[in-house]
Amino acid sequence: MRKNPLVLGVSASVETNVGRIAQIIGPVLDVSFPPGNMPNIYNSLIVKGQGTAGQEIQVTCEVQQLLGNHKVRAVAMSATDGLTRGMRVIDTGAPLSVPVGGATLGRIFNVLGEPVDNLGPVDAGITSPIHRPAPAFTELDTKLSIFETGIKVVDLLAPYRRGGKIGLFGGAGVGKTVLIMELINNIAKAHGGVSVFGGVGERTREGNDLYMEMKESGVIDEQKISESKVALVYGQMNEPPGARMRVGLTALTMAEYFRDVNEQDVLLFIDNIFRFVQAGSEVSALLGRMPSAVGYQPTLSTEMGSLQERITSTKKGSITSIQAVYVPADDLTDPAPATTFAHSDATTVLSRGLAAKGIYPAVDPLDSTSTMLQPWIVGEEHYETAQGVKQTLQRYKELQDIIAIPGLDELSEEDRLIVARARKIERFLSQPFFVAEVFTGSPGKYVGLMETIRGFQMILSGELDGLIEQSFYLVGNIDEATAKAINSSMES
């Protein structure tokens, strides 16, 4: 932690070590330095000069390789348009540092920690380097407690751990960003602490939507910006790979300060962690490394581990991280999602099949898992209900082939009852979201854990066998489903 260095983490002793650009290949620069003055790996370099059109240029880069012959190879954090060979490059003598603390709340930053929301400069007295070691084993906290989300399928079948890492896995267009926005809506509002959102390589429109949503809900207070509850850090799809690779670390550094110095419980949302891997793959290729499986960087596990191991709970405070993970071609065995799986305490897997049926959130109840779903953590009642739901859905899945060809009539009475209950459960796992009210036309619903357990117990026990399955679709608690069934029977 450093007090009052210049913006962008440039050390106060500027221009003590100056090099020259020797080669430019897209976002990668080779820089020559005087003998004996080589910058360290991860040092921040600043290119200053005038472009061909006379415009002022200032590009920040990060040292990635020491090449020999007094040259280093660095990756640019912004566009390299207008750079030419021979331009002066200043070694700042330290890694990239970003503003941290209360001054970051309510503001939007880029990877360099510069505000990009047109609300003026950030008055941050303290900056922190984005590269730092993970907390030591002796500092870690191992308390186990559930993080209630108000989303039925999550709370019942794959509950989240307070201070844990949660992965939202899904292919393109199955609802990852909507789910993460609903979690922000449900948790960040109810959660008294602060949140940090890292937009890593996703759509700029979604970043803008989220900002507007937070202003409307009061999570960001424009009138009293210091009373806001969230800091936003964006490195979107149009940014160079260097920015997309490091923006997750910028967001994490801000979250770590709230945990370690302010001793708060922090929520860290990352959308999308796959883009972090993808940017690392692009940078790896540009640096000339031999690709590994499916074209990914050979350092995939190391890069992922260095980010994920910093996201943890210590004796001072906790970081609960919720990360959207894009699954290429819906293949969960792809190295990027497979590597992320290893770090997750809970995995929420989104299914294209359920999305096609119109069941939202399209969370696969059989593929989604959680280390918290143990009777000694969640209690016997919760555990037994969750297992009953999974067994019913698993049996329904096994019977699909028989239903598809000979039909329901070929099933035994017991199996027909299981199918009917499974279809009710499947529909009852859907839920109207607050952030999707404009699409569904239904007001959003927050369902408490005890209400969720009671509803599924009633379906499993057979109390609601007489109700039509459609009455369970897109409702909150079980009382709404029974009221909907009574209304539809009266209308018919």
UniProtKB/Swiss-Prot annotation:
**Which EC class is this protein assigned?**
translocase
Return one Gene Ontology term, BP aspect.
proton motive force-driven mitochondrial ATP synthesis
Is Metal-binding among this UniProt entry's keywords?
A: no
Report keywords, A-Z.
Answer: ATP synthesis, ATP-binding, CF(1), Chloroplast, Hydrogen ion transport, Ion transport, Membrane, Nucleotide-binding, Plastid, Thylakoid, Translocase, Transport
**Per its UniProt record, what InterPro entries does this chain match?**
AAA+_ATPase, ATP-synt_VA_C, ATP_synth_F1_bsu, ATPase_a/bsu_AS, ATPase_alpha/beta_chains, ATPase_F1/V1/A1_a/bsu_N, ATPase_F1/V1/A1_a/bsu_N_sf, ATPase_F1/V1/A1_a/bsu_nucl-bd
Q: Listed GO cellular component terms?
A: chloroplast thylakoid membrane; mitochondrion; proton-transporting ATP synthase complex
Do you know which Pfam families this protein is assigned to?
ATP-synt_ab, ATP-synt_ab_N, ATP-synt_VA_C
Q: What is the reaction catalyzed?
A: ATP + H2O + 4 H(+)(in) = ADP + phosphate + 5 H(+)(out)
EC number(s) per entry? 7.1.2.2
Q: Specify which residues bind ATP according to the UniProt entry for this protein.
A: 170-177
Q: Which GO terms describe its molecular function?
A: ATP binding; ATP hydrolysis activity; proton-transporting ATP synthase activity, rotational mechanism
**According to the lineage, what is the superkingdom?**
Eukaryota
Bilayer disposition of the protein: Peripheral membrane protein
What's its job? Produces ATP from ADP in the presence of a proton gradient across the membrane. The catalytic sites are hosted primarily by the beta subunits.
Similarity-based family = Belongs to the ATPase alpha/beta chains family.
How would you summarize the oligomeric state and partners of this protein? F-type ATPases have 2 components, CF(1) - the catalytic core - and CF(0) - the membrane proton channel. CF(1) has five subunits: alpha(3), beta(3), gamma(1), delta(1), epsilon(1). CF(0) has four main subunits: a(1), b(1), b'(1) and c(9-12).
Q: What is this protein called?
A: ATP synthase subunit beta, chloroplastic
This protein's species is Pinus thunbergii (Japanese black pine)
